[in-house]
A protein has these predicted regions:
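N-terminal leader/targeting segments
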Residues: 20-28, 44, 48, 104-107
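Membrane-interface helix-loop junction between the first two transmembrane segments
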Residues: 23-40, 69
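Hydrophobic transmembrane alpha-helical segments in integral membrane proteins
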Residues: 1-17, 48
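Membrane-water interface of transmembrane alpha-helices
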Residues: 15-31, 86-100
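Alpha-helical transmembrane-segment detector that highlights a single hydrophobic TM helix
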Residues: 10, 23-24, 62-75
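Hydrophobic cores of alpha-helical transmembrane segments in multi-pass inner/ER membrane proteins
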Residues: 12-17, 51-60, 119-122
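Transmembrane alpha-helix detector for multi-pass membrane proteins
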Residues: 38-69
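Alpha-helical transmembrane segments of integral membrane proteins
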Residues: 1-6, 69-160
Length: 160
């Protein structure tokens, strides 16, 4: 099995790769401000969504911790959901900046989307820790994969 530390390293690496690549391709994003006041309303609504998602993540972590023993998948789930919570906090913190530059705006939106993907992945690993009908697990795995591929496609489309 893959070690949990390696999973964390890959997940953090993917997140860091996106804004670094955006800055490399478009260095003006460091100095530009968002183009309209609508972007600030997007930032505010995303911060509100991050708080709601954070509450869901905390409930799931508490549910896992209430169990008697923690296996590999429970530990992996808690780790991924902890990363998810960290990115949600980053989303909220970035909303506090008044004169948001485009790179911070994109970083906030990316953090929120990425935390959603981590939430979906964490729930998938939580399902793996229980003996359920494999059809349920495969169906959910399909949706998780579709979500990841859609996000990757979106980021690649934005970059190029």
């Amino acid at each position: 099995m893959v070690s949990i530390g390696e999973v964390y390293l890959v997940l953090l690496g993917v997140f860091i790769f996106v804004p670094v690549t955006q800055m490399w391709i478009n260095p003006t994003s460091l100095t530009e401000a968002p183009s309209s006041d609508e972007s600030m309303s997007v930032v505010d609504s995303k911060a509100s969504e991050s708080i709601g998602l954070f509450a869901i993540v905390l409930v799931i972590i508490q549910f896992i911790l209430d169990g008697s023993e923690m296996g590999y998948y429970q530990e992996l789930t808690i780790g991924i959901l902890s990363l998810c919570a960290g990115f949600l906090m980053l989303t909220f913190i970035l909303a506090l900046f008044g004169g948001v530059k485009i790179i911070l705006f994109h970083l906030q939106i990316t953090a929120l989307r990425y935390s959603g993907l981590l939430l979906f992945s964490g729930l998938f690993f939580l399902l793996q820790s229980y003996k359920l009908n494999p059809t349920i697990q495969y169906l959910f795995a399909g949706f998780v994969l579709i979500s990841w591929f859609a996000w990757i496609f979106h980021e690649l489309k934005y970059l190029f």
